[in-house]
């Protein structure tokens, strides 16, 4: 699933080609995504100028003159630029044709993404209760410490809770906990303030590096230019269960935690 770095990589890739452009038309080949694409999306968006391309958590917000298109990439989705008129293959469900002669093409093999229209996107039910962005000053270790008090749940699902902080998915939660030396099974409420301060800094550092590398390509993800990300070459634990730890040489353990596979080092993470 594309996580925050992959979505931010997409945003940075498509924004220069979209902002200021007028939409000629919207071609929808398949409306049945996680939520159906609005039947009148072409009417609402055609003729409008795109004024901004922003991101909130894992949602892309294409701001037009009279509303905003909220897009989520789901499990396997991608947005990339193609020349208008380029034949669409299977799973290429939507084209937003621009006056420039380019089209923003949405591809989603599993159809678990979304394209929704909103006049007030930040008040939309999918966005209004989200926590702070991890790469802003609104997110810090102090927040993690305060929100974790009295919590018995494991620290990994705690930091993956979008009400606590947005965009920290399975890949980057695993890597940040390894970098901070914290066992992902440890109860969130038992972790000290000092360790949360370190964890927050590692979350910020790892997400920033992943964005610089264009995200992590494990299966389907490509950026707005159609190119894969390269952060997977720097993974220490995610997806490496049974392999040797790159730091201490111990065998990495894979467990189920919060209905997800989690890999950690029993020696480096306490």
From Swiss-Prot:
It catalyses: Hydrolysis of DNA containing ring-opened 7-methylguanine residues, releasing 2,6-diamino-4-hydroxy-5-(N-methyl)formamidopyrimidine; 2'-deoxyribonucleotide-(2'-deoxyribose 5'-phosphate)-2'-deoxyribonucleotide-DNA = a 3'-end 2'-deoxyribonucleotide-(2,3-dehydro-2,3-deoxyribose 5'-phosphate)-DNA + a 5'-end 5'-phospho-2'-deoxyribonucleoside-DNA + H(+). NCBIfam families: fpg, PRK01103.1. Belongs to the FPG family. Binds 1 zinc ion per subunit. SUPFAM superfamilies: Glucocorticoid receptor-like (DNA-binding domain), N-terminal domain of MutM-like DNA repair proteins, S13-like H2TH domain. This is Formamidopyrimidine-DNA glycosylase. Monomer. Its EC number is 3.2.2.23, 4.2.99.18. The active site is at 2 (schiff-base intermediate with dna), 3 (proton donor), 58 (proton donor), 260 (proton donor). PROSITE patterns: FPG_CAT, ZF_FPG_1, ZF_FPG_2. DNA binds at residues 91, 110, 151. Pfam families: Fapy_DNA_glyco, H2TH, zf-FPG_IleRS. It comes from the Bacteria. One of its GO terms (molecular function) is damaged DNA binding. A zinc finger (FPG-type) spans 236-270. One of its GO terms (biological process) is base-excision repair. Its cofactor is Zn(2+). InterPro entries: DNA_glyclase/AP_lyase_DNA-bd, DNA_glyclase_Znf_dom_DNA_BS, Formamido-pyr_DNA_Glyclase, FPG_cat, MutM-like_N-ter, Ribosomal_uS13-like_H2TH, Znf_DNA_glyclase/AP_lyase, Znf_FPG/IleRS. Keywords: DNA damage, DNA repair, DNA-binding, Glycosidase, Hydrolase, Lyase, Metal-binding, Multifunctional enzyme, Zinc, Zinc-finger. Involved in base excision repair of DNA damaged by oxidation or by mutagenic agents. Acts as a DNA glycosylase that recognizes and removes damaged bases. Has a preference for oxidized purines, such as 7,8-dihydro-8-oxoguanine (8-oxoG). Has AP (apurinic/apyrimidinic) lyase activity and introduces nicks in the DNA strand. Cleaves the DNA backbone by beta-delta elimination to generate a single-strand break at the site of the removed base with both 3'- and 5'-phosphates. PANTHER family: FORMAMIDOPYRIMIDINE-DNA GLYCOSYLASE (PTHR22993:SF9). Coiled coil: none annotated.
